[in-house]
Amino acid sequence: MQHPAFYVTGTDTGIGKTMGSTALLHALRARGHRAVGMKPVASGCEHTPQGWRNEDALALQAASDPQPDYATLNPYALPAPLAPELAAADVGVTLALEPIAHAFAQLLTQAEVVVVEGVGGWAAPLSATLDQADLVRALQLPVVLVVGVRLGCINHARLTAAAIAADGLQCIGWIANEIDPQMERIEENIGMLRQRLAMPCWGRIPWRPGADAAAQAHGLQLPR
């Protein structure tokens, strides 16, 4: 893989960033890479005997090889299922770059590729003074865009790609994640996305209820 790490963002909340990220991890591992996931900030965590845990972060941990320590994979685990800025304020936490950068550096020593999953859509802030673009810039990461394929996705994908470029960052690929089984003319919509997005498509994840990320990884075609 040309890039030792990349940042996975999405066209919105709930469009399958975690499925895209875990499928990427399995695809990378299938190529023989040591690949680990990271979820720098996660809200909506549940309290367990081991501490606060997030479902998406646990999925990334399970898909990783080697499997990193949870606190390194998810430095900020916030209880409330809210925007990170609000969830952090609820527990008196101020999100900062330094702990994330430190954890990221540790993960880089453990694997060949680190897949960093963002929060919500690209413009969702991390705090009052910290945008996702700031984090991506600080970690010097290219971006992979997961497009939730449903009505309106062409608009959302083009706006997100334009926002990433306007922030001076590079989007190196996109993944079509089919999230609406009732969507009409899906092939044509994906074709329109291919025509209008400048970066290459890294494959598609079909609507397949109950399928795990390892199975969905077969739909991806990663660059060499």
From Swiss-Prot:
GO terms for molecular function: ATP binding; dethiobiotin synthase activity; magnesium ion binding. It is found in: Cytoplasm. InterPro entries: DTB_synth_BioD (IPR004472), P-loop_NTPase (IPR027417). One of its GO terms (cellular component) is cytosol. It is an enzyme of class 6 (ligase). Keywords: ATP-binding, Biotin biosynthesis, Cytoplasm, Ligase, Magnesium, Metal-binding, Nucleotide-binding. Substrate binds at residue 43. It catalyses: (7R,8S)-7,8-diammoniononanoate + CO2 + ATP = (4R,5S)-dethiobiotin + ADP + phosphate + 3 H(+). Mg(2+) binds at residues 18, 56, 117. The active site is at residue 39. ATP binds at residues 56, 117-120, 177-178. It holds the Pfam family AAA_26. Pathway: Cofactor biosynthesis; biotin biosynthesis; biotin from 7,8-diaminononanoate: step 1/2. Its main location: cytoplasm. Its cofactor is Mg(2+). Its EC number is 6.3.3.3. GO terms for biological process: biotin biosynthetic process. CDD domains: DTBS (cd03109). Belongs to the dethiobiotin synthetase family. Homodimer. Catalyzes a mechanistically unusual reaction, the ATP-dependent insertion of CO2 between the N7 and N8 nitrogen atoms of 7,8-diaminopelargonic acid (DAPA, also called 7,8-diammoniononanoate) to form a ureido ring. NCBIfam families: bioD. This is ATP-dependent dethiobiotin synthetase BioD. The lineage of its organism: Bacteria, Pseudomonadati, Pseudomonadota, Gammaproteobacteria, Lysobacterales. The gene is bioD.
